[in-house]
Each structure stands twice: as C-alpha cells, then as structure tokens.
Amino acid sequence: MAVLDQKKLVQSVKELLNYLEVSQWKHKPNFDFLTKSKVIDREGLRKMKMVKGLYTAKTSGSTGIPVKVEKSFMDYVWYIATNIREFRWRKWDVKKNLAQIKAGATKSDFVGWGIPQEIEPIQGMKYVIGYESISEIQKWLEEKNPHYIQVAPSIASQLDFTKISNYIDHKGTGEVGGSMYSSEECGTIAIQCPDNPEVMHVMENIIVETDPDGVMIVSTTTNPYIKRYKHGDVIELGECNCGRTLQTINKVQGRVRNMFVLPNGDKKWPLIGSKEYYDKFGIKRYKAIQTDIETLELHIISEPLGEKEIELILLVKEWINSPVNVIIKYVDEFPNYKFEEFVSLVK
C-alpha cells in the first residue's frame, strides 16, 4: 500500500462516520449515475486498463475467475468506516477483546482493534490468527478467551463457542450466514440490519441491480472501475421496515466454502494460492477438488503450462500446508450451475 497521510485518513473517516449516521435515514441510490455504463463481467474487469491506485485488491471470489482492482483512497476510507459502522450496529464494546481469524495472517496480539484512537480512544486487545486447522483455532480461542470473534461463517460453524467463557458474539463476511456482505473488488456491499437481522442494507457508496436471473450487478461511487459489474452472486432485493432508506438485500444465494480435510481428520479453510494464478500462470479460471485425503485435483482453464506446472503445484502445496498429491487437469469450461471453486469429496 502507498504511504498514507494518517491525519487526512483519520479526518476523512470521522467525517464519513458522521455522514453515515444521518444518511442511513435519507439516502436514495442515484441510478442516473449508471445510465452511460455498460454491464461488464469478470473477464471484462480483468481486461480493463487501470491506473496504479493506493493499493491492489486481488480475488477469485466464488467463481474461480481471478481478478484484481486498483483501489482509491476513498475506497479505503469507506472500508474503515463501514467496518466501524458494523461494530456500532452490532453494539460491540470496543473496550473488550476481539479475536480475528484472517486469511494469510500470523499469530499476533495487538493493543487496540485497529480503529483510529481519535475515533475510539480506549480499545481492548485484538488477537489475530490465520486460517489454521479447526482444532488449532479452537485451542487458540480458548486460550485467548475473547469477547468477540471475527470469523468466516464456514469456519464458525466448525467451532464450539460454548468453551469460550467471555464469548458474547461473532460476525463474519464472504459467505451465506455472514453479518456483512463484501468482496475484495467491491469492498463492503451490505451490512446486516441492526433491527431486522434477516436482511442486509446496501452501503451508500454502492448501487445494486439484478439481471433477469437475479445475478447481482454492482456499482460503486468510490472506484472508477466497478461500474455495473456483474459480480456472479445471485441475490434477492427486498424491503425493510426499520426506517432506513438504504437498498435492502433479502437473500444471497450460494457462497458457502467447503473445508479441506487433513490426514488426521481435522479440517481447514482451503487456501491454495489462487490470487497468483492469473498473473503468474495465466489461469483464467480454476476449480479445486479434494478427491480423497491424499489427492487434490486442480482443474484449470489455461494454455498448457509446461514446466511451470511444477511451480504451480509447489504454490498450492505451500498454501494448503498439507502433504497432498496435487494433480493438474486442463478443461475447456465449467458449467455455471452451482459452481463452487473448492469441493471436498471426503466424507
């Protein structure tokens, strides 16, 4: 990430938080903003020429199609402010302790949640761990004994929160069952309504449409590249009686991650290095299938990699961190019906 003017960042976040307190009750999406924009898909986004931004977001989402987007200063401001908004909507006490289970992270302890002190002067501890095995995460949580836990729903479903005596609440994003709906390329799309938790409210910098099949088309006012972008998720728009005028999402279909099964029967989130697939190997789309305890098939749409297959296999093994046999298979296409980028056939 480029060097930031921290004073400017904090001031911008404070101003945005003040704005959001009022705008949630009066905001209306400006669909005129979209009149000259054509719908683009992930391939269109990938081919788009972009100017270097504050930072680069890389993802394959739930489709197995890697993309990257250059992010602006205001993208980052909205990212911080909407995360603080979610804490406030959920009435989390920032003076208590937070555990964060985050992809690619190493075990660390921090004084403070990472919220600027000018906004929240007194904060509890933040404990961070990566996507380790479920048993390791469970043991770590019991040792740290946090009040709040930030964790992906698929991992949360494998954990026993009753063994954490301080536990109050958990939240997550990226999948069905999450309290926040977000993506790397779009940022925070929607947050669970604090009054009606069965629905989510779309953020003020986001405009959501759907095609005839219910596939979400998302635009953001803070990023020049996310304009009428066909995201790939199927959603259902609706209404909420809480009084907020924000767009409302009733349902998000799909986006549930299967767990990778380890040789000892333990499970973990399947990180397989996919953010590097397009830039390093030219892989346009992929799907990983764990056929048994010892075998992972990586199906890819790509030109033949030749000797680079070995490099790809080593990358997958490094990220999955398990003695698995990786087999590369080339395919021409994937059926879109119920596509999942990772499937485990291990019972």
PLM regions: where:
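Short, acidic Gly/Pro/Ser/Thr-rich loop/turn segments
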Residues: 66, 106-108, 223-225
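Short low-complexity stretches enriched in small and charged residues
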Residues: 51-58, 101-108, 250-259
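Glycine-rich, histidine-containing beta strand-loop boundary motifs that form or position
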Residues: 71-72, 102, 153, 181
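Conserved AMP-binding loop of ANL adenylate-forming enzymes
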Residues: 84-118, 124-128
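Nucleotide 5′-phosphate-binding alpha/beta core
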Residues: 1-58, 63-97, 104, 148, ...
